[in-house]
Amino acid sequence: MLEVDKINVRYGKNRKNALINVSISVNGGKVAIVGPNGSGKTTLLKAVAGLTRLDSGSIRLFGRDITTIYNELRISTNLPDVYRLMRMNTEDTIRLYSELKKQEPEEILNLVEEMDLSDTLDKMLYELSTGQQKMICNLLSLSSSSKLILLDEPFESIDLRRRINLTELITNHSAEIIMNTHEFDVLTKLKGWSLYFIMEGRLFGKFEASEVKNLYINKGVVPNNIFIMETGYGTFSISRDQGEVSVSAARNFNSLLNEVT
């Protein structure tokens, strides 16, 4: 369904690398990509969604080159850029989006009510708090008609109760999903998901997400490592069952790097 082949993305006047030779294939599964802030996670999703221009490489979606695809309704995302284009309140945005996706708006409106977000319906997206906006975009992306869902930091600024409910919605969804996060606590709940690390625009992996409790990160190269990551922070290696710092013990990728460095 999705084939990303050696894509490179650069930005700014200095043409700084955002993604470097990134390749990933998703066909009938779900993928979690974990990395620190500024590692290229969001850029990758924007590239797949057609919101970021590639400098080289290719992306094929549903068997077609992404540059030839327009108005593809089988893909959805929680990236707010998509919904901010609609200058209308939250309820009208949900109704229009549902019409485009050929589904009943009540499917999303019922979830909004279950998440205690009904007071957001008469407000514009930009008027919502960070957590409210994130949650509404999450619910919009989790349309039952979607075949590929791109989730960028779906748990960011979300309270514990909603995080639990959201995790259930995501893990039970039938679509293929690519989810970016810098948090580790959710990974052990993603049984059957593939896991990749991303640092400085380079993708490393893959593992089973539920295996994260057995993974360790080490400064430098250690014997019997699974793979080595060469980064601007230094050289790191990932090992299984023993090592310097347990990946699952860290709250998020940023704190993990602080511990190991």
Residue ranges and their predicted role:
Residues M1-S23, N27:
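A short, flexible loop at the N-terminus of ABC-type nucleotide-binding domains that lies
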Residues V34-P36:
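The feature captures the beta-strand-to-loop junction immediately N-terminal to the Walker
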Residues A49:
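Helix-to-loop junction immediately C-terminal to a conserved catalytic motif
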Residues G57-N71:
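Conserved ABC transporter NBD signature motif
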Residues T77-K102:
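Q-loop/switch helix immediately C-terminal to the Walker
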Residues P105-L121, L142:
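Conserved ABC ATPase "signature" region
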Residues I149-E153, I158:
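Catalytic Walker B motif of ABC-type/P-loop ATPase nucleotide-binding domains
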Residues N180-F184:
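H-loop/switch region of ABC-family ATPase nucleotide-binding domains
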